[in-house]
A protein has these predicted regions:
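Helical hinge/lid and interdomain linker segments adjacent to catalytic or ligand-binding clefts
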Residues: 26-29, 41-43, 47-140
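Active-site rim elements
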Residues: 45-48, 180, 184-191, 203, ...
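Residue-level preference for short coil/turn positions at secondary-structure junctions
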Residues: 35-36, 98-99, 126, 198, ...
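Stable alpha-helical elements in mature extracytoplasmic
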Residues: 36, 54, 58, 96, ...
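An acidic, glycine-rich "communication" segment
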Residues: 36, 133-239, 304-334
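Bacterial N-terminal signal peptides
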Residues: 1-13
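Extracellular ligand-binding/catalytic regions of CAZymes and related secreted enzymes
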Residues: 20-35, 53-54, 61-65, 235-334
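Sec/Tat signal peptide C-region and signal peptidase I cleavage site
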Residues: 15-17
Length: 334
């Protein structure tokens, strides 16, 4: 009997894994009565800040409260289908970008095969709107295949016209440094007063943003940026921590245009905030939802009171290398 139970358990476990592996990404479809007909693709892939937790949560908000169809992609183990943020060379489902009206990316030092990366390149050439979160300033790092036609996107590229790679040329900045003390200081978001007086749609209803991740350093942003939010370091990692007056402020959220050679002009929204625990801040979630509307030409619909309530349970894992929850498959984040 014990042998039969063991065999049955093994078969059941194998069937469950096969079922999970059959779903390499997750899609949320809105009710027909609330669907706006638009598709947002969210791409996770970072080793530290738990994008694999944050993006499904944002996708559920966009679908449930705002009528977007959403698809979430993950860095996975190609053999098992298990989520593995440390695998920098594989994100299944990039072809979903072909039907995307907007993409939200949360990437760090990825080097995807050309067969996957070509969909992202086509997306940019089409001039489609893009949101980049936290480490997406240094989304790509080409080391194994420097001859790839997409190696120009590498964060440390020095080629004329592509200095700073994707981060600087498309989002406005690449990786510079930690302006705040990583792991001991948080970020207090300060809304830009001029943009607020101009009633910029992205910051409508946004006033109270704090997150435990530290402020990233930046230089003068590339292109034609409009800074919407500045970051002030806090002397501690709790929402009531006082600001560190010895630290200057840095831009932490902005918009800008972009255009790759041979492509159409597009718009981006970038923020250097965005870990899974940062998104416990209601107004940070609102910032992303507002940016989604604005980039899709729906800024007039934003009044700052739209729901950004989390759908279902959300217990984000604290950021840290190697600390992602093991044994998870995309379907576990439905």
């Amino acid at each position: 009997l014990l042998l039969l139970i063991t065999i049955y358990s093994s078969i059941a476990a194998g069937c469950l894994q096969a079922q999970q592996n059959d779903e390499p990404w997750i899609t949320f479809t809105p009710e027909q009565s609330v669907s706006n007909g638009l598709h947002v693709v969210l791409i996770s892939g970072d080793e530290e800040y738990r994008s694999e937790e944050a993006l499904p949560m944002l996708a559920k908000i966009l679908t449930t409260h705002h009528g977007f169809k959403t698809t979430v992609l993950f860095s996975t183990d190609p053999e098992t289908g298990e989520i593995n943020p440390d695998n920098q060379n594989h994100i299944v489902g990039m072809e979903n970008l072909q039907s995307a009206d907007l993409a939200i990316i949360f990437l760090r030092f990825r080097e995807l095969p050309d067969s996957e990366m070509r969909y992202f390149d086509e997306f940019l050439k089409a001039g489609k709107p893009l949101i980049g979160l936290r480490t997406s300033t240094h989304a790509f790092a080409y080391q194994k295949n420097p001859e790839s036609p997409y190696a120009k996107y590498s964060w440390n590229n020095n080629e004329p016209g592509w200095q700073g790679g994707f981060g600087r040329q498309i989002l406005g900045e690449t990786w510079v440094d930690h302006h705040g003390d990583h792991g001991t200081e948080g970020t207090r978001g300060l809304v830009d007063g001029i943009m607020e007086r101009m009633n910029h749609p992205v910051i409508r209803g946004v006033s109270d943003i704090w997150g435990p991740t530290d402020v990233y350093g930046t230089r003068v942003l590339e292109g034609d940026p409009e800074v919407l939010l500045w970051g002030q370091s806090t002397a501690g990692m709790t929402p009531d921590a006082p600001v560190n007056w010895e630290k200057s402020i840095m831009p932490v959220a902005w918009t800008k245009s972009y255009q790759v050679e041979g492509g159409s002009e597009g718009q981006v929204f970038a923020t250097t905030m965005g870990s899974s625990v940062d998104f416990e801040s209601e107004d940070l979630r609102r910032l992303i939802v507002n940016a989604t509307y604005w980039l899709l030409g729906k800024g007039s619909e934003i009044d700052g009171t739209e729901s950004v309530e989390i759908v279902g349970d959300y217990e984000p894992t604290m950021f840290g290398f190697g600390d992602y929850v093991k044994g998870k498959y995309p379907s576990d984040y439905k």
